[in-house]
């Protein structure tokens, strides 16, 4: 069920806005920073990418940028690039099993168009809480914190007080949810299907990550993920200017 955050949380979010620019700034004392493709602020991740690059020189093996049009109304946040997925292709969720499930659901709910192996996003952007491949797919708290400035910038791009249509953040997995929640001052614990109105025209929705492990154990199914994105579709379309707005791709 939809659970609004406290009035205090919403007021704190709004108080962190630069009202002249209409942008959300310094959420949780994190200054939004545009993504840097040459970022090397996490020594452990830099060393890991260097070592993977030696074994797989054809792989991307670098920080992975957010994918999708800046004017999109939905931001999807995962955990981190997968070894043979985004770390190989350079695009979030592209090239592995979790991405195949995600993109099939996005296509079914109107957020992507698939033609053979080609994928075009429609009205959404995709990123990760950590932009570099972590060892054992487990980023440290410090690495998550260092990457949070980029996530804050993505949230700034998604929503401002000037927007006239609903915007939505979809957090895939507890770690991504925690990183987004910290920036937005959301206190609600992670729960699959949780739907939280952060401020006017901005909603956060939580889902289990569509990882191979979660799918194989039945923690998440295609039907469950489809339900999540149908709710997202209903929300972003249910606003006065949604149907006339450009959704990008």
Predicted features, each with a name:
Residues 2-12:
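Extreme N-terminal basic, low-complexity initiation segments
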Residues 16-20:
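Intrinsic-disorder-associated, low-complexity terminal segments enriched in Asp/Asn/His/Tyr and depleted
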Residues 23-190, 194, 198-237:
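A polyanion-binding, active-site-adjacent surface
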């Amino acid at each position: 069920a939809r659970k609004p955050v406290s009035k205090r949380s919403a007021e704190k979010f709004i108080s962190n806005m630069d009202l002249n620019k209409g942008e959300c700034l310094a959420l949780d004392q994190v200054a939004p920073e545009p993504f840097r493709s040459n970022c090397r602020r996490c020594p452990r991740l830099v060393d890991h990418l260097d070592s993977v690059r030696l074994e797989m020189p054809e792989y991307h093996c670098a920080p992975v940028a957010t994918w999708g049009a800046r004017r999109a109304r939905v931001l999807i946040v995962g955990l981190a690039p997968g070894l043979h997925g985004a770390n190989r292709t350079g695009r979030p969720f592209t090239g592995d099993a979790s991405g195949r499930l995600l993109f099939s659901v996005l296509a079914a709910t109107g957020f992507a168009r698939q033609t053979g192996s080609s994928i075009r996003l429609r009205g959404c952007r995709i990123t990760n809480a950590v932009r570099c491949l972590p060892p054992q797919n487990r980023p440290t708290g410090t690495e998550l914190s260092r990457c949070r400035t980029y996530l804050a910038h993505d949230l700034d791009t998604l929503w401002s007080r000037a927007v006239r249509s609903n915007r939505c953040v979809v957090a895939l997995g507890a770690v991504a949810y925690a990183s987004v929640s910290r920036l937005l001052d959301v206190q609600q614990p992670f729960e699959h299907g949780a739907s939280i109105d952060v401020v006017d025209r901005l909603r956060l929705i939580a889902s289990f990550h569509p990882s191979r492990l979660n799918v194989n154990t039945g923690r998440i199914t295609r039907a469950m993920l489809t339900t999540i994105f149908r709710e997202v579709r209903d929300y972003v379309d249910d606003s006065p200017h949604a149907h006339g707005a450009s959704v990008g791709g």
